[in-house]
């Protein structure tokens, strides 16, 4: 996965793909048109952040382009960029708010007959992340991309990842 913050980065997808056989995931924030550019250039998966991708019409454009090329979309919910007011609506329950955010965006993509979806629920708080993934696994029938966000230094990241992946049921 690599960040695609601008047009130049999106234009580089084809060149990068020609130099590797590893599947590439474009991490898109704010500008849905960058996702469209990456899809046109053969990206293997697009990751969008429901908290900052823009309106429903933007999601529709990305869903239609991805569907035409059978490219999955990862809905990447990040605790730090939940939709305004969602955490309050969920009574301050962060894992519940994260799953609610994913649910909203799954429903949007499903309205456009798109269901080639992978979900992630990331927080820098390992306990909240584990709870969000457990709730997501009970709520959705989509693959889950596991991970933490803002993991910190290499050592901190290893510890947080180990805690996430070995958390008892």
Question: What residue ranges belong to the model's regions?
Answer:
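Glycine-rich, proline-tolerant flexible connector loops at the mouths of alpha/beta enzymes
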Residues: 1-15, 50-53, 117-120
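Hydrophobic faces of well-ordered beta-strands that scaffold small-molecule active sites
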Residues: 1-2, 24-26, 46-48, 73, ...
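N-terminal active-site wall of soluble small-molecule enzyme domains
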Residues: 3-41
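Glycine-enriched alpha-helix->loop->beta-strand junction motifs that scaffold or abut catalytic
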Residues: 20-22, 40-46, 67-69, 138-142
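Structured alpha-helical segments in the cores of large, soluble enzyme domains
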Residues: 35, 62, 95-110, 129-138, ...
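Active-site glycine- and acidic-residue-rich loops that bind
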Residues: 50-57, 120-130, 153-159
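Conserved anion-binding
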Residues: 54-112
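Conserved small/polar residues in nucleotide/adenosyl-binding loops
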Residues: 165-169
């Amino acid at each position: 996965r690599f960040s695609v913050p601008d047009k130049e980065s999106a234009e580089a997808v084809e060149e990068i793909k020609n130099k590797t056989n590893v599947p590439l995931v474009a991490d898109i924030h704010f500008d849905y048109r960058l996702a469209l550019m990456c899809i046109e250039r053969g990206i293997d998966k697009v990751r969008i952040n429901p908290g900052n991708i823009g309106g429903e019409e933007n999601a529709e454009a990305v869903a239609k382009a991805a569907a035409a090329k059978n490219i999955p979309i990862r809905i990447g919910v990040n605790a730090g960029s939940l939709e305004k007011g969602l955490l309050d609506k969920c009574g301050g329950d962060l894992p519940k708010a994260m799953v609610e955010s994913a649910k909203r965006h799954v429903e949007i993509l499903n309205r456009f007959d798109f269901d080639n979806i992978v979900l992630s629920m990331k927080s820098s708080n390992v306990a909240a992340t584990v709870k969000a993934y457990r709730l997501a696994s009970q709520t959705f029938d989509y693959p889950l991309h596991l991970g933490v966000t803002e993991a910190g230094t290499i050592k901190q990241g290893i510890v947080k990842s180990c805690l996430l992946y070995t958390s008892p049921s």
